[in-house]
Amino acid sequence: MGEYIMEKNTIILGIETSCDETAVAVVKNGTEIIANVVASQIESHKRFGGVVPEIASRHHVEEITVVLEEALKEANITFDDIDAIAVTEGPGLVGALLIGVNAAKAVAFAHDIPLVGVHHIAGHIYANRLVKEVQFPLLSLVVSGGHTELVYMKEHGSFEVIGETRDDAAGEAYDKVARTLSMPYPGGPHIDRLAHEGKPTIDLPRAWLEPDSYDFSFSGLKSAVINTVHNAKQRGIEIAPEDLAASFQESVIDVLVTKASRAADAYNVKQVLLAGGVAANKGLRARLEAEFAQKENVELIIPPLSLCTDNAAMIAAAGTIAYEQGKRATLALNANPGLDIEA
């Protein structure tokens, strides 16, 4: 069959509203960002210490049309130039997802444009293709607020979850520990910053689980941090928050990097891709770089910070592959908060 040559440029409009970002992007050929607009709601959720689904949905309703128009203007295109619309159908908050799905269906119907549903985590993985062409087989370490998993891919559009969290996602643990240390939401960046000022002097558990397991568990670690703080308060002992942050972060990163490294060897992959919101963590990025610098036959790809947190360019990138593989959604497409990436 020879090399696959694209006859014309494929222009995909991506829409992402799975949590607290209203995002619309335009991507060319699955690799080049033409427009990438994100309206964040962090300020609205800050005082509640987490995302409030009802508030998130209302914001999406207010923002979606504005963000959509802004993306088209930034890309300097009209709906006639778009080959397909890719939208996050799940997983996420059902009310939030529905706003994006309904907006995508309305545009697809009004302008007679093909529609493609995208898995949110597939989007995070394909954010890496906006940095560099991916090579198979590959392994993706997905670390976000709701997900922590190792995903093996032997080809485009094929996802095998070889390891996942059995309880809390790494991002959840970060937010809960941040709350224990009275830090504002979202906690991840605050812990990361504080960790760099401290030393990992506090002995905290690492959940390795069974010897051959690639699964993760962070609830024990989270409880250990909360108990350490609680016990110190009861005994009137002062614990340096930066040392606690450094100890917690080292425990999380140790397990993530060790398991990713072991899986990369076992599955003989060509590339390891970092994906998800926690991929913005400086400590994690540095440790992965150090680990994979020692492996000559494995290339590590880490997306820029702007592509780690939720955005629609990654949804358009994943949607390009689905579109080229002939996948189409009908106007019956619905939000699916529990969508399985392997389905």
Swiss-Prot record:
Listed binding positions for substrate are V142, V143, S144, G145, G146, D175, G188, D192, N281
Q: What does this protein do?
A: Required for the formation of a threonylcarbamoyl group on adenosine at position 37 (t(6)A37) in tRNAs that read codons beginning with adenine. Is involved in the transfer of the threonylcarbamoyl moiety of threonylcarbamoyl-AMP (TC-AMP) to the N6 group of A37, together with TsaE and TsaB. TsaD likely plays a direct catalytic role in this reaction.
Q: Which PANTHER family match?
A: TRNA N6-ADENOSINE THREONYLCARBAMOYLTRANSFERASE, TRNA N6-ADENOSINE THREONYLCARBAMOYLTRANSFERASE, MITOCHONDRIAL
Name under which the protein is recorded: tRNA N6-adenosine threonylcarbamoyltransferase
Which keywords label this protein? Answer: Acyltransferase, Cytoplasm, Iron, Metal-binding, Transferase, tRNA processing
Record's catalysed reaction(s): L-threonylcarbamoyladenylate + adenosine(37) in tRNA = N(6)-L-threonylcarbamoyladenosine(37) in tRNA + AMP + H(+)
Cofactors required:
Fe(2+)
The similarity comment for this entry is: Belongs to the KAE1 / TsaD family.
Q: What is the lineage of its organism?
A: Bacteria, Bacillati, Bacillota, Bacilli, Bacillales
What GO molecular function annotations does the UniProt record carry, in alphabetical order?
iron ion binding; N(6)-L-threonylcarbamoyladenine synthase activity
